[in-house]
């Protein structure tokens, strides 16, 4: 994947290989993205326009189609029709979708930092970097679903649950992770911040996988011990498992692209890590109290004996009798026992406890953000906070 000297022509020259085939019918439609049910090996595309649209969604998805096309036609590997179709379908199934908060945050943040309209090259690079965060997210989720034995993700069966996929999903997840560095090498290798980007993605991946390990080993089969499920342990899990890649990574990408040294932005990192933990705690809350039809997945934290914010808070608030009920029912895949746990959550008013946490988090974060000396950085942090705040409403 050799790098071209100019990106401006890419919007036209890559159009012939970057748009979905007309026979590929959308099967999930969202406000921000159309996903495709099956790939095709027959190429018959219309060219992309050379003028950047004012619609971020459209621009972002155009870049996605370009990146995907280049990956499945990568000359470093001799794809045949079967392997190309498999990879295309796998990418379409797992990468776009969800809220795409991470990807959009890279572009939004870079725009706010620059303070003026982006050039075509800048817009393309920002979108490409945004998609790198989404590709990393896909890698993490594919493997996370396998480890958790999950059934649905974003309103459809988890990738590994498809009969023709199964354990091949493990290899697919690793492939998605490698795609990130293929994209970075192609478009950023000549940039002065390229090494810092590589280090950022590698460090973020290490932190996330380490957090996943903590989350997994604390609930090994036959070793349930709710006395260990403290708010301290939950904070450690959410910090490493999700905070860095969900919140810090996208903004750090934008800062690097803008020419900033991340070592000069320790305060920004601290704020973003705290917001990232809030994002993960919000996910814990929605796992039990969210509507599966709205959020696209069926919560299983109780059955899986996860050290979620809810169970840690419940154990903090519960009396001895209530702790006994939790011990007897938590972590068991039985609807009646799950119902008892949820009933106790309501009795302890965990909804109210979460709302108190959320309100305090917002106020504290906003105070820290307003204290930052750089107005542009303030705007980036405020944008990040507003995107997350009350995301369950």
UniProtKB/Swiss-Prot annotation:
One of its GO terms (cellular component) is chloroplast. Residues 1-53 form a transit peptide. Optimum pH is 6.5-8. Pathway: Isoprenoid biosynthesis. Residues 1-22 are annotated as: Disordered. Mg(2+) 2 binds at residues 144, 148. Restricted to glandular trichomes during achene maturation. Expressed in flowers and in both ray and disk florets. One of its GO terms (molecular function) is hydrolase activity. Dimethylallyl diphosphate 1 binds at residues 99, 102, 137, 154, 297. Binds 2 Mg(2+) ions per subunit. GO terms for biological process: farnesyl diphosphate biosynthetic process; isoprenoid biosynthetic process. Its EC number is 3.7.1.-, 2.5.1.67. Dimethylallyl diphosphate 2 binds at residues 153, 241, 280, 287, 306. Mg(2+) 1 binds at residues 144, 148. Residues 1-18 have a biased composition (Low complexity). It is found in: Plastid, Chloroplast. Gene3D superfamilies: Farnesyl Diphosphate Synthase. Keywords: Chloroplast, Hydrolase, Isoprene biosynthesis, Magnesium, Metal-binding, Plastid, Transferase, Transit peptide. Pfam families: polyprenyl_synt. The record marks 283 as: Required for catalytic activities. The keyword Zinc-finger does not apply. Component of the monoterpenoid pyrethrins biosynthesis; pyrethrins are widely used plant-derived pesticide. Catalyzes the condensation of two molecules of dimethylallyl diphosphate to produce chrysanthemyl diphosphate (CPP), a monoterpene with a non-head-to-tail or irregular c1'-2-3 linkage between isoprenoid units. In a second step, hydrolyzes the diphosphate moiety of CPP to form chrysanthemol. With a lower efficiency, can also converts dimethylallyl diphosphate into lavandulyl diphosphate (LPP), and subsequently LPP into lavandulol. Belongs to the FPP/GGPP synthase family. PANTHER family: FARNESYL PYROPHOSPHATE SYNTHASE (PTHR11525:SF0), FARNESYL-PYROPHOSPHATE SYNTHETASE (PTHR11525). This is Bifunctional chrysanthemol synthase, chloroplastic. It comes from Tanacetum cinerariifolium. The lineage of its organism: Eukaryota, Viridiplantae, Streptophyta, Embryophyta, Tracheophyta. The gene is CDS.
């Amino acid at each position: 994947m050799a790098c071209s000297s100019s990106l401006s022509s890419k919007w036209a020259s890559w159009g012939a290989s970057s748009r979905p085939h007309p026979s590929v019918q959308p099967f999930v439609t969202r406000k921000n993205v159309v996903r495709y049910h099956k790939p095709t090996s027959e190429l018959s595309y219309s060219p992309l326009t050379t003028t950047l649209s004012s619609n971020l969604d459209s621009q972002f998805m155009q870049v996605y189609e370009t990146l995907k096309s280049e990956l499945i036609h990568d000359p470093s590997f001799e794809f045949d029709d079967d392997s190309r179709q498999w990879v295309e379908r796998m990418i379409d199934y797992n990468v776009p979708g969800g809220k795409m908060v991470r990807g959009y945050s890279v572009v939004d943040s870079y725009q706010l930092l620059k303070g003026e309209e982006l050039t075509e090259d800048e817009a393309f690079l920002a979108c490409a970097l945004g998609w790198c965060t989404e590709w990393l997210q896909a890698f993490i989720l594919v493997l996370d679903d396998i480890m958790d034995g999950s059934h649905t993700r974003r309103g459809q069966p988890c990738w590994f649950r498809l009969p023709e996929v199964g354990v091949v999903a493990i290899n697919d997840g690793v492939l998605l992770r490698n795609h990130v560095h293929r994209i970075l090498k192609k478009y950023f290798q000549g940039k002065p911040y390229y090494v810092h980007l590589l280090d950022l993605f590698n460090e973020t991946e290490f932190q996330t996988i380490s957090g996943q390990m903590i989350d997994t080993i604390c609930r090994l089969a036959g070793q349930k011990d709710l006395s260990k499920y403290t708010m301290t342990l939950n904070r450690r899990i959410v910090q490493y498992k999700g905070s860095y890649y969900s919140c810090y990574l996208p903004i750090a990408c934008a800062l690097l692209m803008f020419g900033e040294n991340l070592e000069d932005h320790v305060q920004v990192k601290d704020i973003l890590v705290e917001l990232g933990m809030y994002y993960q705690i919000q996910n814990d809350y929605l796992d039990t109290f969210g509507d599966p039809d709205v959020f696209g997945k069926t919560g299983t934290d109780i059955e899986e004996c996860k050290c979620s914010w809810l169970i840690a808070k419940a154990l903090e608030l519960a009396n001895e009798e209530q702790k006994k009920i939790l011990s007897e029912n938590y972590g068991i895949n039985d609807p009646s026992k799950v119902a008892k746990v949820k009933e106790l959550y309501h009795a302890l008013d965990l909804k109210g406890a979460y709302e108190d946490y959320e309100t305090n988090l917002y106020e504290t974060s906003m105070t820290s953000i307003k204290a930052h000396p750089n107005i542009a950085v303030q705007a980036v942090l405020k944008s990040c906070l507003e995107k997350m705040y009350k995301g369950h409403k």
